[in-house]
Structures are given as C-alpha cells and as structure tokens.
Curated annotation (Swiss-Prot):
Catalytic reactions of this protein: 5-(2-hydroxyethyl)-4-methylthiazole + ATP = 4-methyl-5-(2-phosphooxyethyl)-thiazole + ADP + H(+)
Family in the record: Belongs to the Thz kinase family.
GO molecular-function terms, A-Z: ATP binding; hydroxyethylthiazole kinase activity; magnesium ion binding
Pathways per UniProt: Cofactor biosynthesis; thiamine diphosphate biosynthesis; 4-methyl-5-(2-phosphoethyl)-thiazole from 5-(2-hydroxyethyl)-4-methylthiazole: step 1/1
Keywords: ATP-binding, Kinase, Magnesium, Metal-binding, Nucleotide-binding, Thiamine biosynthesis, Transferase
Reported function: Catalyzes the phosphorylation of the hydroxyl group of 4-methyl-5-beta-hydroxyethylthiazole (THZ).
Amino acids binding ATP: 125, 171
GO biological process, one term: thiamine diphosphate biosynthetic process
Its EC number(s): 2.7.1.50
Name by which UniProt lists this protein: Hydroxyethylthiazole kinase
Enzyme class: transferase
Cofactor(s) the record lists: Mg(2+)
HAMAP family, per the entry: Thz_kinase
C-alpha cells in the first residue's frame, strides 16, 4: 500500500485556486460549530451560508458551489432538510460532502448516513471509527471521538471510496485521503486541536469547498487537510491553551492565504 505525500507546491496551488474561486458553501452543519465553521471558510476566502429550513434548503443547494452535510446534532426535521438539499445537489450537479459524526455509536444517524450514500457524495470526511462504521467494517467510537488509529481505517476508506465514488478523508495524527486507488498522507497538526470543538467539522466544510475547485479533486481535498494542520501548528506555537488557540488558528489560516497571494 503506497501512501504519497502532498507537496507544498500542490497545497499552495490549491489555496490559490480556493481564493480565486471563492466557493459559496451551503453548510448544513451542527449547532455547536456553526460560528467556527463560518469563520474558517471566511478567512480562507470562501462564502459560508447556514441555510437549514426545509423550504429553502433545496433552493439554496441549487445555487451553491458546494454543500456540506454534517449530522452532529441530527434531528428528524434536520434530516428532512438535508435529504431535500442532497437530492437537489445531485440534480444540479453540486458537489456535496458528508461528515458522518458519531455514525458508529448511534443507530438512527447510521441508518440516515447509509441512506445518503445512495446519493453519491463527492467526499466523505470522518475520523477512523466513523469511516470504518460507515464502510460496515466495525461499529465503534466514543461518541464523536475515535477509538481507532487513522492508518487502521485506510482499507475501509478505500472500500468506501470505490463503492460510492467519493473521495474519503480519514483524519487523525496523520490524515489520509483516497479515491479508492491513490492515497495521499498529510503530516502535521497538534494534539491541542482535539481540545477545541469544531476543528474536524470546520475541515469538512473546507473539504466541501475544495470539491468545487477545478483540477485534481483528490489533491485539492488533501490540500484542505494540509492547510488546517499547518495553521494548527502555527497557532499552537503562539497559544497558551485551548482558549487562546482559536483566534490564533484563524489568524494562521488568514496568513496562509496572504502568503500565497504575495
């Protein structure tokens, strides 16, 4: 199993494309992370929109550059809105990304996410336990937390990618991105990133945005992981703990975009 590493040049090129195209991202995400997710997209140059009302979700999915479905605070009403948006995204050829939060621990959301897979997501982003559960290999995880190493989920990610046609992202100490054949590994980040709510969910939104960019989607999605890990490392170096990490993280993402444009 060969794992390729993403080059700095590939990451910088993707970030330039991101800023150039400024994707409009329809974020149907969980209630806990909306502000952090929106700010992450904004500082990178995207336009976030948190449209969840069932009567509007389908309409907005047709005009957005990309759609994110995050089931972190799933309710039956949210599920109806998400289904409407996904169906419209498929009809409009809008790329959409699934973040199957805690799918291995809870039956209702697992059934819902499996139903959504029939609509062929462009990308799927989760931790090792979530990806393994979605692939039907194991049910696990401790709520939103993983109990498996990212590398252990690579076979499940490849299987899921081949079955759905999606690019699958497994996040952890090292991130892995695969289309079922190629695998790209991304080093970096810091354990402090796991002590702040929303870094993974925000990454899923950036992944969704990257699916709307031209070029190699696998490399663009892998670049999203690289930006987040790189910003995390920079932020940790300036932070005293989780409380000061978040503003430093947003500043670090902003600085990455400025460096690419310089």
């Amino acid at each position: 199993m060969q794992v390729d590493l993403l080059s700095s040049a590939q990451s910088a090129h993707a970030l330039h494309l991101f800023h150039q195209h400024s994707p409009l991202v329809h974020c149907m995400t969980n209630d806990v992370v909306q502000t952090f997710t929106a700010n992450t997209l904004l500082v990178l140059g995207a336009s976030p929109a948190m449209v969840i009302e069932t009567e509007e979700a389908s309409q907005f999915a047709a005009i957005a550059s990309a759609l994110l479905i995050n089931v972190g605070t799933l309710t039956q009403l949210c599920a109806q809105s998400m289904c409407a948006a996904v169906e419209q995204a498929k009809s409009s050829q809008t790329p959409w990304t699934l973040d199957p939060v805690a799918v291995g621990a809870l039956d209702y959301r697992r059934r819902f996410c499996l139903e959504l897979l029939s609509h062929k997501p462009t990308a799927i982003r989760g931790n090792a336990s979530e990806i393994m559960a979605l692939a039907g290999i194991a049910n696990g995880g401790r709520g939103v937390d993983t109990t498996d190493a990212a590398a252990n989920a690579i076979p499940a990610a490849q299987t899921l990618a081949r079955e759905t046609g999606a690019i699958v992202v497994v996040t952890g100490e090292m991130d892995y991105v695969t289309d079922g054949h190629r695998i790209i590994g991304i080093h970096g980040g810091d354990p402090l990133m796991t002590k702040v709510v929303g870094t993974g969910c925000a990454l899923s939104a950036v992944v969704a945005a990257c699916c709307a960019l031209p070029g190699d989607t696998l490399e663009n999605v892998a670049s999203a992981c690289h930006w987040m890990k790189q910003a995390g490392e920079r932020a940790v170096a300036r932070s005293e703990g989780p409380g000061s990490f978040v503003p430093h993280f947003l500043d670090a993402l902003w600085q990455l975009t400025q460096e690419v444009q310089a």
